């Protein structure tokens, strides 16, 4: 009998051991089904310290794990975040941000005004000037950046009674809007974010989520909420949106940003798509130096507008026609639109060429538009379209650009930042237009006069505004973007 005891005991122990694994796996499966959101992204960056090379989807990671003094919703309303109240002086130069007393880091310690000031000092030292315009508008900030003064003595960012007090060099109506951008979200020990893959477990987080795992192909975020809803979000590197969508269709992804165009109608019919306007616009420069008359430029614009109109009839989820407006918001100005429509319909003699050429940056938007334009011209005119899609350094060759009849320009059509918007066109303007644009005297009237001129000359004309599309699974009942085009992780339910 004794000779059987040892084998029987071993079988019992091994069986109990395996049952333990089965139980653990069941728990893991339940959690995966109920609590985990899988978000497909095209790449995962190691460096989250500076913004020079981050895409909008890379920025989403920072938005998930950190909060700013203020935020901006999809309707461009400025909302409190770390600051519970904002007080602006009568002259518009000084701002007081009263920090909420009930906000905490991911380790449970309280977030204070001193934390914000330390972060702003680090941000001024570590990030590139082009990414921190809002802070460089602060009195003394540029001198500190250039090493001419200390932060404590020279920069007008101070702490008082758990408030952050900021004084600008001059009134800036865009200051709060700029401050909502992801780069100004509070990050502890900023230098450690340069290798966040290595340091993710050493830093603490000010946002709705914290990073709990960082691998080459996946980042795991866990909710900081204490309400019992410990939601987990996996950001999974799928290399391209087609791979994300394939995984979405078999239930392995719950969020896909801008799924393939061919899938949009099906997703919409299934109730699995949110479509929102975004600032990305496409504009057409028509080269007046290539012997194309005013009437020729007018006809080209008319033809290309018709090609976009035909295309939009089956792709209304992807974009909205500009219809003569440089900003989406201006489409409500019916008088202006009617005037521009009348101008566009003038007819004069023009002898069209056999071939027209288009140059543009090589991206998915431009590839699709060039294909559509080429096809429409072949079917509706006697003009052939030849186009070139080039990488950034090749595209920026000014001598090369002069040899093309048209150039597609992708621009951020943010009506709150007209200066940045119009300066994107500066290389395509006359010397007198450049002088106006590069002066410090631009206001809304100046921009409007400039806009009317380049439209009436058919030099730079608006074509379309793109939409943001989000595919989401049945696991999600609510999801939103913020006013900067980033994912609002606090909205996910």
Which stretches of residues belong to each language-model region?
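Surface-exposed binding/hinge segments that line
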Residues: 133-190
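A structural "hinge/loop" feature
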Residues: 41-62, 82, 109, 175-185, ...
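N-terminal lobe/hinge region of extracytoplasmic solute-binding protein
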Residues: 40-90, 121, 204
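Extracytoplasmic/peripheral linker and loop segments enriched in polar/acidic and small residues
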Residues: 311, 383-395, 409, 418-477, ...
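Gly/Pro-rich hinge or "lid" segments in bacterial periplasmic/extracellular proteins
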Residues: 168-234
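Ligand-site clamp/hinge motif
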Residues: 217-218, 223-266
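Aromatic- and charge-enriched surface segment that lines or borders ligand/interaction sites
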Residues: 85-135, 292
């Amino acid at each position: 009998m004794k000779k059987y005891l040892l084998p029987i005991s071993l079988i019992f122990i091994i069986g109990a051991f395996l049952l333990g694994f089965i139980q653990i796996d069941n728990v893991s499966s339940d959690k995966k089904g109920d609590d985990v959101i899988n978000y497909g992204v095209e790449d995962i960056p190691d460096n989250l310290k500076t913004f020079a090379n981050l895409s909008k989807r890379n920025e989403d990671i920072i938005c998930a794990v950190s909060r700013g003094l203020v935020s901006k919703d999809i309707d461009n309303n400025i909302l409190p975040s770390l600051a519970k109240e904002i007080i602006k002086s009568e002259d518009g130069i000084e701002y007081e941000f009263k920090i909420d007393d009930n906000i905490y880091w991911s380790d449970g310690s309280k977030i204070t005004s001193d934390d914000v000031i330390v972060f702003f000092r680090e941000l001024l030292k570590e990030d590139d000037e082009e990414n921190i315009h809002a802070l460089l508008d602060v009195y003394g900030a540029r001198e500190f950046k250039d090493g001419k003064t200390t932060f404590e003595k020279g920069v007008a960012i101070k702490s008082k009674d758990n408030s952050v007090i900021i004084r600008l060099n001059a009134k800036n109506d865009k200051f709060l809007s700029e401050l909502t951008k992801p780069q100004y979200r509070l990050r502890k020990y900023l230098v450690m974010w340069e290798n966040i893959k290595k340091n993710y477990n050493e830093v603490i987080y000010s946002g709705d989520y914290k990073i709990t795992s960082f691998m080459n192909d996946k980042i795991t975020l866990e909710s900081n909420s204490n309400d019992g809803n410990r939601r987990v979000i996996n950001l999974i590197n799928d290399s391209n949106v087609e791979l994300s969508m394939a995984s979405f269709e078999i239930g392995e992804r719950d969020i896909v940003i801008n799924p393939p165009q061919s899938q949009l109608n099906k997703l919409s019919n299934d109730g699995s798509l949110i479509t929102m306007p975004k600032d990305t616009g496409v504009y057409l420069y028509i080269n007046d130096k290539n012997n194309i008359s005013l009437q020729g430029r007018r006809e080209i614009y008319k033809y290309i507008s018709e090609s976009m109109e035909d295309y939009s009839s089956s792709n209304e989820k992807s974009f909205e026609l500009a219809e003569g407006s440089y900003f989406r918001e201006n489409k409500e100005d019916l008088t202006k639109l009617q005037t521009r429509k009348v101008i566009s319909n003038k007819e004069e003699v023009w002898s069209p060429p056999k071939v027209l050429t288009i140059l543009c940056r090589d991206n998915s938007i431009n590839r699709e538009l060039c294909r559509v334009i080429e096809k429409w011209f072949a079917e509706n005119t006697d003009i052939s379209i030849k186009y070139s899609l080039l990488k950034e350094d090749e595209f920026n060759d000014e001598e090369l650009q002069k040899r093309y009849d048209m150039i597609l320009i992708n621009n951020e059509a943010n009506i709150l930042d007209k200066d940045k918007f119009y300066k994107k066109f500066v290389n395509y303007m006359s010397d007198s237009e450049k002088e106006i644009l590069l002066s410090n005297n631009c206001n809304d009237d100046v921009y409007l006069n400039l806009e009317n001129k380049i439209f009436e000359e058919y030099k730079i004309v608006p074509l379309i505004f793109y939409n943001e599309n989000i595919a989401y699974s049945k696991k999600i009942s609510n999801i939103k973007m913020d006013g900067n085009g980033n994912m609002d992780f606090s909205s996910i339910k």
